[in-house]
């Protein structure tokens, strides 16, 4: 996941460290934790049969965030803008499959007119 961090930081963005992707299994937020920052060689070795989410949060400002009093809403500590996306990925014998990509490569909801 190191490459996401390097790419974002080259563009002067930051990767939130307080949240991560997660495994999908018997429970929704399962093992492993999928960090979106770090150094090459750190983290868990991915193995065939693992299913997990990749869901980085990328901030215009600093990577620090805080959770509001409702216990759910997260905001950037410096009030900068942030974006988040998510994909579900499975590790296969020959590599990986991204299950949340559209077969028709939709980049916006198909019911909306361009």
Which residues does each predicted region cover?
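Histidine- and/or cysteine-centered catalytic micro-motif in compact active-site loops
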Residues: 18-24, 57-59
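Glycine-rich, acidic
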Residues: 8, 28, 82-83
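Short, small-residue-biased leader/transition segments that mark boundaries at the very start
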Residues: 1-2
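Short, basic/aromatic beta-hairpin or loop at an interaction surface
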Residues: 21-34
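Acidic/glycine-rich phosphate/pyrophosphate-binding loops and surrounding catalytic core
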Residues: 6-20
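Charged, cofactor-coupling segments
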Residues: 38-114
């Amino acid at each position: 996941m190191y490459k996401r961090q390097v790419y974002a930081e080259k563009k002067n963005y930051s990767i939130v460290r307080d949240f991560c992707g997660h495994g999908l299994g018997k429970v929704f937020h399962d093992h492993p934790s999928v960090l979106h920052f770090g150094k090459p060689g750190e983290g868990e070795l991915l193995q065939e049969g693992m299913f997990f989410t990749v869901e980085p949060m990328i901030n215009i400002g600093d990577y620090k965030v805080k959770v509001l009093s409702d216990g759910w809403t997260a905001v950037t500590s410096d009030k900068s803008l942030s974006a988040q996306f998510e994909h579900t990925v499975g590790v296969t014998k020959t590599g990986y499959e991204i299950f949340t990509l559209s077969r028709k490569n939709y980049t916006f909801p198909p019911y909306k007119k361009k």
